[in-house]
């Protein structure tokens, strides 16, 4: 038996980063393209762009940037830090939930 936990980071009551946005940023980092990242994540380009902009507005910091005269997109140091924090928290939560299930099953 498994216990599943869905969580995300919010600021001022609005979503900043969850699993989907983390995956989107990682796909941008790997491929350098929002269009390709959106395809990989199974969402439209417009939806991907909207999610990024909403997160950036809530944070007050850019998560992606483009270089003048160049095609493509790169994630910012802020985005890299958020991805790292997300994975760190997620790993700890997964271990904790597994431990809770294990202890609960032993008690019965």
Q: At which residue positions do the language-model features occur?
A:
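Basic, amphipathic "hinge/linker" alpha-helix immediately C-terminal to the N-terminal HTH DNA-binding motif
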Residues: 66-89
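Alpha-helical linker/hinge and terminal dimerization helices associated
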Residues: 82-104
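Residue cluster at the C-terminal edge of the helix-turn-helix DNA-binding motif
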Residues: 57-62
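Short, Lys/Arg-enriched N-terminal segment that forms or immediately precedes the first helix
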Residues: 1-13
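Short helix-boundary/capping micro-motifs
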Residues: 28-38
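Residues within the DNA-recognition helix of helix-turn-helix
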Residues: 51
């Amino acid at each position: 038996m498994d216990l599943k936990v869905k969580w995300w980071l919010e600021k001022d009551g609005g979503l900043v980063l969850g699993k989907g946005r983390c995956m989107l940023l990682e796909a941008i980092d790997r491929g350098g393209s929002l269009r390709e990242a959106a395809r990989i994540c199974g969402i439209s380009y417009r939806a991907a762009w909207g999610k990024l902009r909403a997160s950036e507005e809530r944070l007050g910091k850019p998560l992606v940037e483009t270089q003048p005269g160049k095609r493509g997109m790169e994630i910012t140091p802020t985005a890299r830090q958020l991805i790292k924090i997300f994975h760190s928290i997620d790993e700890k939560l997964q271990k904790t939930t597994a431990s809770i299930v294990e202890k609960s099953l032993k008690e019965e």
